[in-house]
């Protein structure tokens, strides 16, 4: 049941992030904030409850599975999802509130955060992450 709740939360969070576009700037939308990786292949979304890394390409398999995400050298447990419900867009979600807050703190440690997900190193510019402070408490 907990896995199902995490999947549903990741889907809802992902759909909120998918509905807008931005490039290399942190943008707040409601209680969420998002940006793109430097290469534009990934969208990173944060909220008080989650951190989501979403590929801008289609995945092939249909699965929810346990995974990990590395942020500036710290490793977090995550859920990796590929589902037709999300248009086969691959998503890795930290749906645990404590882990999400810790991961967001890790993001803020460097001007160019290094996220290890999808077997790749994803570079994210965090210079203007403070734009999220009114939307995401962990950024304050």
Where in the sequence are the language-model features?
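A generic "folded-domain core" signal
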Residues: 22-140
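Bacterial N-terminal signal peptides that target proteins for export
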Residues: 1-11
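C-terminal segment of classical bacterial N-terminal signal peptides
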Residues: 14-22
């Amino acid at each position: 049941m907990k896995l199902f709740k995490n999947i549903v939360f990741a889907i809802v969070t992902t759909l909120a992030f998918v509905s807008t576009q931005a490039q290399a700037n942190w943008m707040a939308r409601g209680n969420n904030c998002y940006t793109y990786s430097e290469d534009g292949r990934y969208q990173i979304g944060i909220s008080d409850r989650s951190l989501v890394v979403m590929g801008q390409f289609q995945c092939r398999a249909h699965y929810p599975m346990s995974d990990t995400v590395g942020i500036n050298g710290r490793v977090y447990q995550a859920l990796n999802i590929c589902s037709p419900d999300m248009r086969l867009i691959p998503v890795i979600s930290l749906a645990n509130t404590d882990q999400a807050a810790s991961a967001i703190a890790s993001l803020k440690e460097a001007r160019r955060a290094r996220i290890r997900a999808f077997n790749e190193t994803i570079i994210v510019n965090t210079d203007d992450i403070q734009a999220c402070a009114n939307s995401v408490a962990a950024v304050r």
